[in-house]
Amino acid sequence: MALTKAEMSEHLFEKLGLSKRDAKDLVELFFEEIRRALENGEQVKLSGFGNFDLRDKNQRPGRNPKTGEDIPITARRVVTFRPGQKLKCRVENATPKD
């Protein structure tokens, strides 16, 4: 099961007493700020959580799996996430819920 933006909004509504609309707007604004920073080529550092970085991948040769034809895979920019040490430790020591 995955945590969704709607569930995050619901948690903010329950824990902080925000209105449902304000909670939804807060979650949307948070992710919009991360998107904006990455679109501008900036690194996003969330203390105690991790870093979002941009990485440029070079063009490379590829192959169409159906036809076997060689095709170039174009150069592109990708987003990577590196978890921080605190997050790694908490995940490692967490007991999964069923």
From Swiss-Prot:
Keyword Transcription regulation attached: yes
UniProt keyword terms in alphabetical order: DNA recombination, DNA-binding, Transcription, Transcription regulation, Translation regulation
Cellular component GO terms held in the UniProt record: cytosol
InterPro entries for the chain: Hist_DNA-bd, Histone-like_DNA-bd_CS, IHF-like_DNA-bd_dom_sf, IHF_alpha
GO terms assigned for molecular function: DNA binding; structural constituent of chromatin
Entry's Gene Ontology BP terms: DNA recombination; positive regulation of metabolic process; regulation of DNA-templated transcription; regulation of translation
SMART domains xrefs: BHL
Region (Disordered): 49-71
Superkingdom to which the source organism belongs: Bacteria
Disulfide bond sites: none
Signal sequence bounds: none
Quaternary structure note: Heterodimer of an alpha and a beta chain.
HAMAP family, per the entry: IHF_alpha
Family the UniProt entry places it in: Belongs to the bacterial histone-like protein family.
Function: This protein is one of the two subunits of integration host factor, a specific DNA-binding protein that functions in genetic recombination as well as in transcriptional and translational control.
UniProt protein name: Integration host factor subunit alpha
Source species of the chain: Edwardsiella ictaluri (strain 93-146)
